[in-house]
Amino acid sequence: MLQGDWSSDVCSSDLEEIIMKMWKKAASVMLASAMVVSLAACGSSGNSGKSDSGSSDADTFKIGGIGPTTGDAAIYGTAVKNGIQLAVDEINAAGGINGKQIEYKFEDDQADSEKSVNAYNTLKDWGMQALIGTTTSTPCTAVVEETHSDNMFQLTPSATAVDSIQYDNAFRMCFSDPNQGSASADYIAENKLATKVAIIYNSSDTYSSGIYQTFATEAKAKGLDVVAAEAFTADNKTDFSVQIQKAKDAGAELVFLPIYYQEASLILAQANKAGFTPKWFGCDGMDGILDLDGFDASLAEDLMFLTPFTANATDEATQKFVADYKEAFGDTPIQFAADAYDCVYVIKAAAEKEDVTPDKSVSDICDALKKGMTEITYDGLTGKSITWSEDGEPTKEPTVVVVKSGEYQVLQAEDAAE
């Protein structure tokens, strides 16, 4: 019966019955196999609300970074990327964190919130266990929603907006917008730089408007006369003739610029053409103005701004960092590079304080680093005896630099009012 014509031995109805039984048996086997696979998958899934990366055989820490390496803000993201790389290389050469090496990966977000979230997801898929980033405030505010949901530790080197570290898993290395605004007003008043002050700010930018608000409040409290407060937006940031003229007509002795250096360079050039020569004072977004292509650096002479770092500082740590950075990347580091460099060493200090190892889950690493951050005191490039509160804010002293002969120099209090 195994050979020959089935029709000669089996009637049509019997043949159909045999075929149906065979199909049912095959289907049962396939269904059972599928259930085994499904149950195995369910057994291996973790808590969807928390990131569960990390395994018992993990032997390296995976640290990710996010910032703009292309686009208008590329100077900031590139500096952050390089600063992290320099610190990672040093730490790995010295034995790593708790004896474990660091793997490092950086993603470009073009200072865009949606791209920043995509970059975060890319790094998470890579296996990131802690994030240094993001570099700018608005993307950071978007990404912190993701890191909070995943209980991923996040330390931003340079995002200053209050909401960019609004959850307990997030910390910052830099000053916040409110801190920069109040510290700037205090410095101007206490060093008698001016009594009549104008402000030109970007009302469409979180960083700029945040600093403006606290500066205006603190300036009034310190007895400064804010004679003009002129806004511009992202859609109108090339012609500042109206804002400059209003500040000039109001008799401003000093103009406060809580903005980024790109717009500041245009304001300085246009004010010079208008014959308006007040004192100029900015914040950390001003760092990089001397490196802007096509900008006449002489227009920034005597420009002052608040920053935690200057490459011309004479202490040994800064001089070594600057020399190593120049050798590695061919540029002089700006504050963003120093902030990022410090971030890696801060994570190392917190991890060693809590004996963190890379075989732990992302969530466990985050919880340990959160605890460690509030217990360490850190001496770095961007401040001495830095401590952190549970809400992620650092406590450190600001530095004011001034542009002299095309270089940044630390401004001493006795020289400020000259």
Give a label for each model feature.
Residues 1-14:
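Single conserved hydrophobic/aromatic residue that forms the stacking wall/gate
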Residues 13-29:
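Bacterial Sec-dependent N-terminal signal peptides
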Residues 21-25, 43-418:
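Extracytosolic ligand-binding ectodomains
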Residues 30-34:
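Repetitive helical segments and hydrophobic/amphipathic motifs
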Residues 37-41:
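C-terminal motif of bacterial Sec signal peptides marking the signal peptidase cleavage site
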